[in-house]
């Protein structure tokens, strides 16, 4: 990452799972990290102790997004990268107003990265050719669609499209790409039957874990040429 290594990497939703693994990966590389979190999981205390700057944020409103952006602007003169990992998962189901489901999914997956990319643009610029990055975390369902999570899939598709628009806007100083994962790791409460059904959906029949994501993120950060692209992490699921 060269001369920009002293600049922090911002990870939204960094308190658990993939976001947390990414935060520790960079900390272990002596790379400064800023993490947003909504709920104070015990892991946040560990990140703070290790030197990460952890900022509590509520992305459910635009005011909350902009308040977080203001905190970032106060805390650093530049950013090495923004990793938009914060996510929510809502299904269309009886009792859940459809307007609320759609608004929630669009707020976290579209409004939040859109507003943050604009608000923090000046922190990414001025560091040299292809010296900064934005990475959007989308989803495998962008390609396939989902009959049970229509609003979720639509919001992730919008984020995928924004990848190309921001790549055009911010080049050549900032590279903008997206990662579209399917199953990466299970939740602790997932039972054996569910796990096997999920594994059978891909050709590779495995949940690769966070390292697969970390390796791809590292590739995108070190590339000086790749921008405006989406990278599937689906184990060949599209061929099933």
From Swiss-Prot:
The active site is at 152 (proton acceptor). Its EC number is 1.5.1.50, 1.5.1.3. It comes from the Bacteria. GO terms for molecular function: dihydrofolate reductase activity. It catalyses: (6S)-5,6,7,8-tetrahydrofolate + NADP(+) = 7,8-dihydrofolate + NADPH + H(+); 7,8-dihydromonapterin + NADPH + H(+) = 5,6,7,8-tetrahydromonapterin + NADP(+). CDD domains: PR_SDR_c. One of its GO terms (biological process) is one-carbon metabolic process. Keywords: NADP, One-carbon metabolism, Oxidoreductase. Disulfide bonds: none annotated. The keyword Oxidoreductase applies. It is an enzyme of class 1 (oxidoreductase). PROSITE patterns: ADH_SHORT. Transmembrane segments: none annotated. InterPro entries: NAD(P)-bd_dom_sf, Sc_DH/Rdtase_CS, SDR_fam. Catalyzes the reduction of dihydromonapterin to tetrahydromonapterin. Also has lower activity with dihydrofolate. Belongs to the short-chain dehydrogenases/reductases (SDR) family. FolM subfamily. PANTHER family: DIHYDROMONAPTERIN REDUCTASE, OXIDOREDUCTASE, SHORT-CHAIN DEHYDROGENASE/REDUCTASE FAMILY (AFU_ORTHOLOGUE AFUA_5G02870). This is Dihydromonapterin reductase. It comes from Escherichia coli O1:K1 / APEC. The gene is folM.
